[in-house]
Structure formats: C-alpha cells, structure tokens
Amino acid sequence: MKLLALGLVAGFAAVERKGFLQAMLSRPIALGAMAGLVAGDLDAGLTVAVPLELLWLGAVNLGAALPVHEALGTVAIAGGAALAAEVLRAGGAGGPALLPAAAAAAVVLCAPLALLGRRAERLVERWNERLYARAEHDLALGDDEAAARVNLYGIALPFAISFLLAPLGALVSATAIPLFLERVPGALPPLALGLVTLSAFSCAAGAKAMRAARAKLVYFAGLLAGLGLFAATVLAGGGP
Amino acid sequence: MKEGAPRVPPGALARCFGRSLFLQAAWNRRGMQNLGFAYAIFPALSALYADKAVRREALARHLGFFNCHPYAAAAILGGTIHHEEKVAAGLEPPGAPVAYKATLQGPLAAIGDGFFWTALRPLFGALAAVGTLLFGWPALVLTLTIYNAIHLVLRIGFFRTGYRRGDDVVGVIARLSLPAMAERLRLAGAGVCGAAAALVAARADQVPRSGALYAAALVAALGYCALARGAPLFLAAYAAVAVGVGLALLTHLFGSPL
C-alpha cells in the first residue's frame, strides 16, 4: 500500500515538474516530505529533502536542456529511507544514527535513478512527437477539439514511468539497506556521518548552481558568518 | 477595437489561463510547447470563430513551433488572444498572432529562465531547506506558500497584461527590471547556501563522532572549489559521502584525527 502511495506521489510529481503547474511541489524539498509522509515517516522524508534540494538546486529546464530527474530520485530515496528505517526499527535497531544512516544508504542506492529518469524523459520527448503528428492528423480530419486535446495525453507516459520506477527504487532500498545494516551494524555511525558530509557538499552545490558572478564570495561569507555565530553561541554557553 | 467586434468572454479567458498551466504537457523536440499552446488558446478560438473551417485554420497556425518559459508564456498567450480578436474583427491579417509569438518567445524565455528558474526558485529552495533545518515542516509550507503567491500573481498578471496591452506587454515586463532583481536574488541564494552549510556543520557537532563539525565545514568549502573547477556533480556527491564514511572509519580505527 505504501509503495502504491509512493508511486502515485512520484507520478504526480513527474507531471507537476514539467507538464503541469510547476509550483515547486515536485522539488525535492516538498517531495521528500510528501514521500516520507506517505511512507509513514515524515522525519525520514525531511532528512533527505534538505540535502537533495540543495544538491539539485541547479536542476532546471532551460530551453531544450534536460536536467536530472530530481523528482524521481527524491521519491525513491525518501521512500527507501523511510521504509528501510521502518524495517530496521522492527528488527530492534535504534539510536540517533539509524535514520541518517538509512538515508545516506538510500541516497547511494537510488540517486542514479535521477539519471535514468533523464534518459526516460528523452524517450518521452520522442513519444510526444507522435502526439504532435496525431494532432496534425486530427486537424486534417476536421476534428479541432481532438487536435487540441492531444496535449493532455502527454501526461500519461511521465506519470507511468515514475509511478513504476520510484517505488521499485524504494523497494530495493527497503530490502538491501536493512540486510546490510543488520549484518554490519558498525556501519551505522559512518553512514550517518556520510549524510552529514553529503549535506555539507549539497550546500556547496546549491551555491554553485546560483550562477552569480560573486556567488563564491557570498557563499563563503555566509559559511564563515554562520560558523562564527555558532562558535560565539557555544562560547557564550548557549550550546549548539 | 471597433464597436461590436468579437471579444473573448471572461469565462473563456479563464479557461485559457487554466489550460496554460499544462503548456509543457506534451513537450516535444519538433514543436516544443506547440501542443500546449494550441490546447491553451483553443477556448478563445472557439469563442471567436463560430465557423469551423476558420477555427481549424486558426488552430493550425498555433500548432507551429513555440517555446518559452512556462510562466512568462502566459503573457504571450494573453497577447496572442488580443491579436486573435483583431484578426476576428478583420483588423489584422491571420499571420499577426503568429508573428507576435515568434517575436516575443525568445526574449520572454530569457527573462523567465533568468528570473524564475535560476534565481527566484533556487532562492526559495534554499530558504525552504534552511527553514526546514531550523523549524521543521511548518517553515517548508510557509516558504512554498510565499513562492506560489509570487509565482501565481506574476503569472496571472502576465496573462492579463498580455491580453489587455498586446504588444505593450514588453514595456510593462521590462519595467519590472527582472534581470537586475534576479542577480540580487542569486547572490542572496548563495548566501543562504553558505548559512545552510554552517548550520549543517553546527548540527554535525551532535553526531557522536568527534571532528564531524570540521569535516562538514571542510567538505562545504572544498566541495565548492571542486565544483568550480568542473568536478561532475554526481561523482563529487558520492565522494562527499565517502569522505564522511572514511573519516568515521578512520576515527574508529585510530581515534579522532581532528
């Protein structure tokens, strides 16, 4: 049931990111939360949503260029992390490192789906050329309403691809991650730190995606100011 | 417009705008957003051309190539309806709406991509990420609500202005100074990403591994430099995970290196 819900969320996101509305609902930050929610673990969704949003901040459709399919990757990763953590908890595992470790492992396993999604999108574009031909055909037959309506048929294939692939990725994560972590419980803290370093790198990727001439300067200024503020808070006894 | 000239009723205009949200539903390499544009403008054509043959001809001219930023395209859709009304009234030749689209799609695509896709949306993405780190999901909901309030107000405004002003929409959009604003938003976004990196590092201090804070700060700094030198994003991301895992293993084996 959760896999079906993940499929529906992924399908909706695949349509929203390009074919309909584009209101940031298919961005990793929103989608990770939604995927986590339908998989029964909002925290897991938010844990991956933040680094994935920043990592793929530059994933935008500019002209005919195709970015990675960040929506497909996000649902698979967030769903996989949530389901894997659920299996691990059911097996008696726990502790603060469990969720970040499951999230890091889900990123490692499912991030390539974002690349696969981009390839699939190329196929969709070719398929849509057939829809163009169909619209011309309908118009030649005199059915202008049918010719105009053809546009909506373009929604089906992106929906179907993500509906199938995202739950599949989540299922692989939910199976492989608990298997690995139950056999190698010592991997939990290293993977948790892996998520921290990935998150830190994602911030750099986000700043780089800003495409501003002085972005580097402002990014490092923000980083240093933030660290300085943190150090001052710790020194003042406020704690992290 | 002369007295009694055909006008598109408000209901049909609203349907056109609603349909424009599906502009890229069947994006294809040959006509790009052509199917979406034809779908969006169809209610207006139905209202203007009762004669089926004339309407078919009108739809055929909108099945030609079209590509623009999906938000900014609302202005062109509104303006094209404006021109179609003139065509229906006999004030312009049938080629006028097509020429209007061809003239505006490039410049408005550049403005839309530059402002929305590479400035406003990334900034709100970064803000949502930082807000979620600090305050959880309510900050996420609030950020998305603000973004969409801006997005929808501009999108609807573009459509209305295009419809009412026709060719003058260019001047109206130019007065918004979106490219200059975009540069400031991008810089703000970079600053927010820097603050996010500091926040991630500060929170790393809570991970039960000494040196996590330093590792996060170092990766945030070196990561930017690596990307600036052309490192591929995916490989660099995997390397970042490997750094964290490797550091934790080293700490486990040899004690804290930092």
Give each language-model segment a name:
Chain B
Residues 1-93:
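Soluble N-terminal domains of membrane-associated systems
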Residues 96-98, 161-177:
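Juxtamembrane inter-helical linkers in multi-pass membrane proteins
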Residues 99-132:
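Transmembrane alpha-helical segments and their cytosolic interface motifs
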Residues 138-152:
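Alpha-helical transmembrane segments
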Residues 141, 200-216:
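Structural signature of hydrophobic alpha-helical transmembrane segments
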Residues 154-158, 175-206:
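Alpha-helical transmembrane segments of helical membrane proteins, especially in multi-pass transport
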Residues 220-244:
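Interfacial loop-to-transmembrane junctions
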Residues 245-258:
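Juxtamembrane boundary at the C-terminal end of a transmembrane helix
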